[in-house]
């Protein structure tokens, strides 16, 4: 299983994300995920830059790692034709190192233009048609599309990459997993769910990528790490479909008052012990994932990269960390 780094656009500004991307490459991570949000989940996280601008900067700051959006919603806030152009441009800049991760989105980000937030079945239907629009435009030449949800009239993407990026579909339930198997080049999810992986593979056939995301918090003590997780990411422990339907960071903050500190960090490896990190990672390997992308919660980025370069990545990735690279690169932004 290959190990990558998960860049959090909700928790860090664009300049800091570029800095983290450089450190991740130097530490020996195999790839990058980057989240795409209009809003953070809560005000404490405090950021949400425009991901496509950040991707352009990362393309120039790195030279080896694949970069995947994790994930972009191409259905409500941004028309899939615009996503098709943005992804094509990113693929040109990254020269074969870009993958487009797509999902059905959350009201938190997609409600901002006043559009009605659709029911889950409609959202999946829109996602399927959005992928059709994107792939149609990636064929090159003048294209039109007249579907149930989207219209495209005489549109052409002039800058297409030599190698079209794969499209990964995010899934958290049986319906979205089946959709990913049917229309995606790969599948991405969070949590070491072996049943979901098996369901995807049984429907998709062989050869399609399965990638996962995981949060971690490296700190001087386990207690400090758990406090950091609770302060920044209590929303991760919210049950059911709340993450898809709550419309603002304030609503997430209100709902998160029902989450205890223990619940918030229950599934997050916390503290300085590499064995705790390895145990959490191994669960994904045992579940059958091909790739795992790990997000460090909080501002202890240098200790995280040091620990992973020296203790974690050598057990999984083929790449070796460079020496002397974990020096601060200026103030975070």
Question: What positions do the PLM features span?
Answer:
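Active-site-adjacent structural elements that line small-molecule/cofactor binding pockets in enzymes
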Residues: 1-333
């Amino acid at each position: 299983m290959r190990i990558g780094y998960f860049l959090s656009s909700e928790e860090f500004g664009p300049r800091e994300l570029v800095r983290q991307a450089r450190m991740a490459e130097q530490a020996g991570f195999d790839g990058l995920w980057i989240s795409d949000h209009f809003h953070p989940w809560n005000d404490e996280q405090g950021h949400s830059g425009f991901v496509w601008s950040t991707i352009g900067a990362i393309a120039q700051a790195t030279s080896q790692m694949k970069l995947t959006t994790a994930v972009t919603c191409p259905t409500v806030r941004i028309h899939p034709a615009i996503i098709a152009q943005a992804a094509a441009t990113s693929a040109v800049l990254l020269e074969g190192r870009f993958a487009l991760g797509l999902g059905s989105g959350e009201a938190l980000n997609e409600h901002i233009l006043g559009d009605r937030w659709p029911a889950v079945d409609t959202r999946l239907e829109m996602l399927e048609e959005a992928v059709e629009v994107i792939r149609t435009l990636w064929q090159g030449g003048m294209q039109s599309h007249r579907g149930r949800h989207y219209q495209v009239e005489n549109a052409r993407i002039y800058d297409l990459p030599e190698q079209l990026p794969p499209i990964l579909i995010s899934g958290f339930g049986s319906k979205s997993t089946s959709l990913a198997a049917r229309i995606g080049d790969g599948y991405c999810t969070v949590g070491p769910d072996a049943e979901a992986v098996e369901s995807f593979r049984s429907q998709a056939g062989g050869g399609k990528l399965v990638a996962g995301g995981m949060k971690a918090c490296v700190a001087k003590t386990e207690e400090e790490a758990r406090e950091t997780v609770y302060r920044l990411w209590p929303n991760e422990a919210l049950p059911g479909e709340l993450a898809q339907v709550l419309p603002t960071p304030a609503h997430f903050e209100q709902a998160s008052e029902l989450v205890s500190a223990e619940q918030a960090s229950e599934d997050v490896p916390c503290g300085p012990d590499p064995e705790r990190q390895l145990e959490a990672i191994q669960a994904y390997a045992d579940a059958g994932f091909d790739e795992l992308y790990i997000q460090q919660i909080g501002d202890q980025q240098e200790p995280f990269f040091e620990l992973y370069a020296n203790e974690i990545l050598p057990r999984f990735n083929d790449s070796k960390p460079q020496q002397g690279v974990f020096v601060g690169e200026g103030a975070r932004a």
